[in-house]
Amino acid sequence: MDYRKLKSGSDVRGVAVGEGATLTPDVAKTLGMAFARYVAGKTGKPVERVSIALGRDSRVSGPQLLEAAAQGIASAGAKAVDYGMCTTPAMYMAILTDGFRPDGSIMVTASHHPWQLNGLKFFTAEGGLGFHELDEVLDLAQSLETESPRATGEIVSTQTRTTKSSRTTT
């Protein structure tokens, strides 16, 4: 798999449904692992202290790709936090808003593109990854493609916390 072929500007995009799929769960898992390691390098933190938030839109392939990316993050040794269905701005704002403040985030979406496509948008505290930063993640993913996961991080969901918060405010 040539990960650079998934590049669409500063995002990753590919066919996620049907024959000829290029953005598969295995690819999303490798990209999650690569992004966790990229963020660790950028923040200077050990990967075991890195946390990455994940969200998705309503596309049919979203839940599977989000879960795969979360598994990749955890297999790198980092913490993956599943925000479930949310907006792209929410994934960036999660990094900046007091409270959890993950070190990075991934939004699983293909924006306005046809339903069979999907993609990944990557964010750090500086904003969405730029063209060259995405190249770093894709090159890292390429080098990790055959690597077996060694570390085990954690995958958590915000859904329980949100439900509890909703109950206490009524």
Language-model regions, residue ranges each:
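Gly/Ser/Thr-enriched, mixed-charge loops and adjacent short helices
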Residues: 118-170
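Generic secondary-structure signature for well-ordered alpha-helical cores
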Residues: 37-41, 78, 139-146
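Pocket-edge positions in alpha/beta enzyme catalytic cores
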Residues: 20-23, 83, 129
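Ferredoxin-reductase
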Residues: 44-125
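Short, charged, low-complexity patches
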Residues: 24-28, 84, 134
